[in-house]
């Protein structure tokens, strides 16, 4: 493992430092031997390399070592250097930090945090023990480091924010020092400095000094013997128990336990072997919190080791030792703060304990506690060496029993041994208690108690964690928490140590509690009793917190920072990921997931189980010390308690499964995540101040370090990428994902920083809590349903990351589970990265959602953080690319996203498999949403009401049809701000389902507030800033969606058809989340509009690249702001085109082509297509999301403007949305959500009339789509199979990480049909989909007939994506109808179809529409064109169905001229049916070209998956080109108000000749995307609605709208390629198509319509037009390309820069800057030694050495005998050598005679050739002549007897002599 490598390299490196310092140190050999491999005791501790032990034990400690090494390098690696440099500085800094922390401990915040953290740590112990020990191990050191460091980091952040006074010296006061400390955190020592209180450094330093003398004296004998004995025992025991220990270590999330194990591995060997060196350090060092402790330990170890291990100590702590410092620091802290532990650890260390920097208080307590703990140590001996075991905590009971007599070393070692034993032993709780008793009697007993209390608490509270998984996780996490609690107590003790009275009291209390706990620990069998004792201990801790007063909150907070720093470390290193892995592995997968869900906060792993426990404990502590915490802290703790109370009520419901509990925690985290967002923002600031690079750097490190773990810990990555993710993307990401990154503990104990930031938010939070309570009530009924959803979706979102967590997820998401496990390892890194982007965004959305209600000020900050997320969308993008395989990231992320969303979807699917019910609910919800949408439009408050009702409906939908509902809602959400708000609700609920009911409530509350803001925002959406914000947010969200889409696309690959449905749903959910992010960001921007500068500055700061792209989008938006509808429509068109083309194919191809996935995002905006390519590499979903966000914003604004009807459309569109998610689900979720929101509004309009029919159709489509997220094409295939025109057969082979789409284009079909086959998983649904598609097509047709105005739009939205062929048919009808409306457009459209397809159909139409179409027409057409364009883009992806963009455009058209559109749609539907009839003949007349056109359209659906590739593929296939032009035509017609535009799109299969122009068009379309978007957005709205209406109404060809079929609005002037002059405008043979509107009644003649090709002249003209427009397309490409490039370059460039930064940070942290440095040192030395050894070995092998050795051995006889053999047998080869040897060696006659004898006898001795050679040098001078004679006399050497033989013999002898000598 990397850990092994790092351990090896690190160990050598560490050994170099270690040996250097060990050489200085008396115990250096022991250190070398024990820590020789070293990351501090890496190998020596176990008797075999710690890495091996890790590996052997877990493979997790290998990762731990790796991560600790990474941490060492990334965070601790510097610390190693800094520690070496500034051990004294570290000591001073530690003193400062300890002072600050002591103050913080007095505040009690640290204790809370430590308790909570200890709980998670302890929980992971059992959980890790129980579950996936190997996956956990990599995080164990890293988790420890990461969790501890992250915890420390988070603590630092928290302490910095709320507790800056708490951590004034540690974090707040010495930010420089913090930076140094964070460097030291980066360097374990500094982290420990941070982590360990002042006493800890002193304890580490002084106890080591004492222990160096004492251990050298008293314990060296015990230590050396004990180290040897115990080293052997410990190594053996560790080897034996290492797996268990590693599990406990992992169970501790490597925070305390893994540190203990590691430390105790370090400590045991070092503590025992070099107890002087490490002895005290290890026992002292094993503080609960590795990060700070590691700092302290590293600092302390350098200090107490006389800086012998200055570098090595940190180094050992780094690799194995970073985990070790957890225990070491814990022990340090315990020794210092809770002197009972110090005495237990150092009972012989009374001097050392007294000498601890604790000073008199510590000395007193050392004596005091030493005696009790010596008594306890004796008790420990009595108590099956439990306390002695606890002393070392990791020492095994055998060794402990053996060495219990050696209370100091024996007890320490025994404690370490037993601690390890306990940690590793299944009786982890008992041994943990035992461990806890001596080692941290207060601390570890606290841990055990906390462990038990946590388990108890979790059990009692269910702690939102499943008891079973949580209890295991509680044991594991409680172990970590115990470590942390021990740290808390230690911190309390240290705080009290700083305040001797308080310390004594705390220590006394700790001793009392420890004794009590020890007593209980003596009875560890009773886990409930343990939990009771834990509760007592928690009470003790609470009492301590009370004793500490404010210090309790401070301790909790400070320790929370430890924990947070652990999270921070996990951000850098998957330390927390270890816990998360432990949690996840434990089947606490929920914890794992939860951590992942909290944006992968590593602390969420600790605090996921822990956050619940931690928050509960925090609540207890907060309740106990609420007076003491700052008002905001206490208030927020109270809020958290209230929130927790609200949620625990839910969460107890949720705890049904660990995932659910985790989810509940995550909802809590998300609920408090807003607070944590602020906190994380501060944390980010802290991280940045600390030089962590802020969230980005942390994320980078986390990515680089955590990504490797991510395979094991995709959730750990999720956690650390939740956490790391929080840190990584942005400060806002941190803020947004603070719950994950900064801490779920922070989330759960937001009272720290979030309270400060959210002090104004508290009332709102209460509001939110009330809303959440209401939501909980609303959700309450659904909670059971949602519970499964939230349980599964939460893991789906959060736990997907790790296959580990898949175990809990598996039951709920069986399909996703399988995929997840696959993806867990494969996409763990990317998935964590994805979690960073997607869950973070989800968190951002949720937090922001809550925040806008909470406080506008907070919201701007959160938008800031979210904008930073957007800005760090780069990092999110980079996070995906961060692992060099962008595809891995994206694929893994995609799969994770799929799990992340797919699980939700799956749960929703499972909950609401009946799409009919979903449809009904969707119809009801859509109608309610219509009402609410109108309300939203009317007033934000009614929007909030609507949100509530819509939320209820959404929840019902979710409960019943979580997949479809989420899809609908996400899409609704994206499409209109009102819908966006609704979708926010939906997305929140989607997220809630992903996160859990608790978060659903929180999100719902947030959404209520957010939606109140959202209507404003939606209204503001038209304004440039909100749009920009939306753009940026959308960029973020789109990025996340891209990520999630890729996740979805990749994860469900293995999943199944249902998984695909879930994937579609999940993508939709992710889109919903992303859209939530969009809308929340929009809402935040609404708030930010209030504080636009802040938003802009934050955008500019954090999302400079995004802002550049966003500014491009903003420029577009501002361009379009004048024509906001156009902007929205244009963006929507882009989105739809992108979604239809890019997303659909992205589903299939995203895994294969993350680039394509990116492109999918960008095809949405053709501009972004090129950008998408960059996005692919840089994962710049941001730029397309910017366009998408612009589209979404504009669309949303437009929807709000035009969307009183939209609500109807919403519901109807929702089915379409599911279709879109299927097609577009992965990169399109935003786009899909955005488009579907509009489409949905339109659909809701239709839904009023044909809602149920369409819903049935859509539900089927949705079901199919959901089943086949990648199978959107499959939908197309299925849809198209009935209608055989151009048949694009896509065989989607879904492999683990890749979706391979093989597209075959056949011209056989009547209608262009895109048949998508999913090789294994999805094919059944493929087959099944055609039916729903056809049924739904008919239903949609009926619905179209019913709701003609919406018919094309809703139907098109639903069908274009879902039923590609049905909509191809239907669109053909709609399109033909549209053509009938616009006769010229129809005839032109055939040509235009080619042209439009070439031009990506959306943009060419947009461009032409802009100039050619009158403003009236433009207004109408634009209104339609956005939808049309969207559908075009979608339909290019999905052929007719893929033209869902048409529904959006139609929706836009309907929004603006919705009334007219409806009437027209109805009128045109009548005409449409007539035109359909006419068009059937026409289509038959145009049959060849139309088939080709439709075929390209369908094929375009596939190729568009690669945004450009897909479009170009479409262009190539001609069908794709036709499909886009059909889309455009259909869009234009839909824009004209013909809701049949989907059919028309489909009905106008473009000639294959479109293909070349299509490709050109796709490029031009990309280029023109901006221009088209800008110009066409106005033209779109104006021209689109009216010109198409005119065309539809008049049925006459509109010369002004030559391309008005789809391009009608602005086709000729703006888009030359469409109207390559004027030829296409009037002369399109489709001009006769005008009658089609009348003729093509909206009868769904799928075959006839699609079959009817553009009039044969139109096809040539189309080809000609295509050829002509291609230059225009180039121009368009210039526009689009410039825009895309602009968007992309800023974003891409920034992203790239950020990627570079992240790469450097990660590469350095991971690979080698620091790791390699350490490794180089160690590796270089080892290599050099190896070389020497190799030389020796080579010589030995060759025989020179052997011969040299053999020479004295008297090998003369052997040589002679060999000579005989050689002469006889190998005369030439061997004989020559033999002769040479023999001549010199056999000079003596005696030798000759012997030789002769030997020759006779020694033919078997030919082996002695080497010996012979050896002798030859010795004899060479004397007997070579005689030997020749002898040889001759031998007779066997006769041949060799020649002088040549003598010469050879002499030469060989000389050579051999040289060699031998």
From Swiss-Prot:
As stated in the Swiss-Prot or TrEMBL entry, residues carrying the post-translational modification Phosphoserine are 28, 37, 136, 140, 143, 221, 224, 285, 348, 478, 498, 522, 552, 598, 605, 610, 628, 728, 732, 739, 741, 825, 884, 893, 939, 1051, 1140-1141, 1146, 1162, 1166, 1353, 1541, 1562, 1594, 1656, 1682, 1816, 1821, 1824, 1829, 1842
Pfam families per the record?
A: MAP2_projctn, Tubulin-binding
Task: According to the UniProt record, list the residues that bear Phosphotyrosine.
Answer: 748
Record field: compositional bias (Polar residues) = 354-364, 598-613, 780-792, 886-896, 1087-1096, 1514-1523, 1615-1625
> Where do the Tau/MAP repeats lie?
1664-1694, 1695-1725, 1726-1756, 1757-1788
Q: Which GO terms describe its cellular component?
A: actin cytoskeleton; apical dendrite; apical distal dendrite; axon hillock; axon initial segment; basal dendrite; CA3 pyramidal cell dendrite; cell body
- Name the Gene Ontology molecular function terms of this record: actin binding; calmodulin binding; dystroglycan binding; microtubule binding; protein kinase binding; SH2 domain binding
Q: Which residues carry this modification: Phosphothreonine?
A: 736, 1161, 1359, 1608, 1611, 1622, 1625, 1652
Q: Basic and acidic residues composition bias: which ranges?
A: 1-11, 109-119, 174-194, 207-220, 365-381, 410-423, 438-468, 669-685, 766-775, 929-938, 948-987, 1104-1162, 1360-1382, 1413-1431, 1446-1466, 1473-1483, 1529-1546
- Source domain of life: Eukaryota
Protein name, as recorded? Microtubule-associated protein 2
